[in-house]
């Protein structure tokens, strides 16, 4: 199956409405990942089909969970997941990509320029040391244990905001170790077309 058709079929299976222009931009992002990966080791994946599934479709499962937000922070963004695919599809949301690895933030800056993402800002630094970002939703994909994620980022969450942590298997143990002042709003299993692995999103808020 041609890559454009694979992406289109995956998006349709997920029930998402994403324009042709945005889909083309998502594939251009995959091209940038492949190009820069040779030097910067952004992802262990080399196969384009797997990149479409793991980096595009997997990231796009976040979209229904950021409806109505104006600002989002992607912590430990790495090669830009889920932040860049979200930014491509939601140009109305101001998104900050944060990572401590300067090679990765150099790639992110270049990707933002080449993809024309006016709604994205890249910040290089450790999350605990960042103080000039405040977001309606703070998200991460495979960044840290839930308790660490919320404690390290609580100062970056706006009042009334929430965390959206993208996880693999149901994180029962991690949920049990959350601090008392954090409320579990929802844990939802995610279906990613073409991905033979468990995925969950955990929505958390301050009590």
Swiss-Prot record:
Please tell me where S-adenosyl-L-methionine binds in this chain.
76, 81, 127-128, 141
Q: What name does this protein carry?
A: Ribosomal RNA small subunit methyltransferase G
**CDD domains under this entry?**
AdoMet_MTases
**Gene Ontology MF term list:** rRNA (guanine-N7-)-methyltransferase activity
Main localization of the protein described in the UniProt heading: cytoplasm
Which source organism does the UniProt entry give?
Answer: Neisseria meningitidis serogroup A / serotype 4A (strain DSM 15465 / Z2491)
Top-rank taxon of the source lineage equals Bacteria
For this chain, the family text in UniProt reads: Belongs to the methyltransferase superfamily. RNA methyltransferase RsmG family.
Q: Which EC class is this protein assigned?
A: transferase
> Gene that codes for this?
rsmG
